Amino acid sequence: MMSQPPKVLLLYAHPESQDSIANRVLLQPARHAQHVTVHDLYAHYPDFFIDIHHEQQLLREHQIIVFQHPLYTYSCPALLKEWLDRVLSRGFASGPGGNELEGKYWRSVITTGEPEAAYHQQGLNRYPMSDIMRPFELTAQMCRMHWMTPMIIYWARRQSAETMKHYARAYGDWLENPLPHGGV
């Protein structure tokens, strides 16, 4: 008997989603997976008034949380930052009694506007992507979540359609079997 994949909450945050071909292509396999909930934050909260209790309930119902967004100013879009600050509150995700996310998994799926070579000591950005991702990794740690290796699509808008299909297939394959050794 095959076990069901764990429930995945895909938090998608892109303020100009209609213009992001790369992110639309990446979302396709997720939208077809029964165990994946795609939650478009900008579609749900165009006014930035986040329903904290609803968001926290979604987190409780899923084992793997995917944060899919473009890299904006070495971070995430503003609404996702607001979401992180408000939803992952003390007493829920951290601090005394804040163990609701303990043991869950965090994976970031990031698109960038620059090539991979820009993310090195001698590159345009002077720091590797692992350094830029550190605040997200530390947030996962604060929430007692397991940090998973991020999926980074460099220079996303300049990727060929074939290359983006390859990334989407790899993403879809991962979504079907997201945990090493299949266990939660």
From Swiss-Prot:
BP-aspect Gene Ontology terms: positive regulation of potassium ion transmembrane transport; potassium ion transport
Record-linked InterPro entries: Flavodoxin_fold, Flavoprotein-like_sf, K_H_efflux_KefG, KefG/KefF
Topological type in the membrane: Peripheral membrane protein
Keyword list, A-Z: Cell inner membrane, Cell membrane, Membrane, NAD, Oxidoreductase
Gene Ontology terms: cellular component: plasma membrane
UniProt superkingdom: Bacteria
Reactions listed under catalytic activity: a quinone + NADH + H(+) = a quinol + NAD(+); a quinone + NADPH + H(+) = a quinol + NADP(+)
Enzyme Commission number: 1.6.5.2
Pfam short name (any one): Flavodoxin_2
Main location: membrane
Keyword Membrane included in the entry's annotation: yes
Gene Ontology molecular-function annotations: electron transfer activity; FMN binding; NADH:ubiquinone reductase (non-electrogenic) activity; NADPH dehydrogenase (quinone) activity
Compartments (UniProt record): Cell inner membrane
Role description: Regulatory subunit of a potassium efflux system that confers protection against electrophiles. Required for full activity of KefB.
Matches recorded under HAMAP family: K_H_efflux_KefG (MF_01415)
Family: Belongs to the NAD(P)H dehydrogenase (quinone) family. KefG subfamily.
UniProt subunit comment: Interacts with KefB.
Entry protein name: Glutathione-regulated potassium-efflux system ancillary protein KefG
